[in-house]
Amino acid sequence: AAAIPVPVFSSSLLQVPALALATGRKVGIITASAKHLTAEHLRNAGITEGIPVVVKGLDDCPEWQKLHKYPNDRLDLSVIEDYLVQMARKLQQSDGVGSLLLECTDLPPFAERLRQETSLPVADYVSMLHWLLKCVPGGGACRGL
């Protein structure tokens, strides 16, 4: 706050404390790579040890890995979407999560299907921007988001 005079929303992870408070349950964080999302990232986003989270990544999704290994290949988005749905269901059933946070900026297109399939609240970078725009005067004028 001392560095610049405007609010900064740098990560969708900033929504995790609110999701945990709203549901009273664990938040399932889905990220591109679980091994690269460290405890330090979580702490810097205000996710303390008292906030229950489960982090899962797309590290084992071959179709998702094409993004990095074979960037010129065509992706089958339905395969990625189905993988995410199965992951979300497992988080819901086995890990007892009450909400989902899509940490990667490539994941918002899948949010609605995850909501439909799990009936859980699903937040992502786009939902964070919508919230911000609704909070500021004149923010509703940004209809493109």
Give the predicted meaning of each segment.
Residues 32-36, 59-62, 106-108, 129-130:
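Glycine-rich beta-alpha junction loops
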Residues 1-15, 96-108:
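N-terminal glycine-rich phosphate/adenylate-binding segment common to multiple enzyme folds
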Residues 37, 43-94:
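Active-site rim beta-loop-alpha module in soluble metabolic enzymes
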Residues 122-142:
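Short, flexible loop segments at boundaries between secondary-structure elements
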Residues 22-59, 137-145:
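Short, glycine-/small-residue-rich phosphate/pyrophosphate-handling segment
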Residues 14-19, 35-38, 129-133:
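Short gly/pro/ser/thr-enriched loop/turn and capping motifs at secondary-structure boundaries
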Residues 4-13, 27-31, 115, 119-128:
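Short hydrophobic/aromatic-enriched beta-strand-loop microsegments
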Residues 85-117, 121-123:
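Extended, basic/helix-rich recognition subdomains
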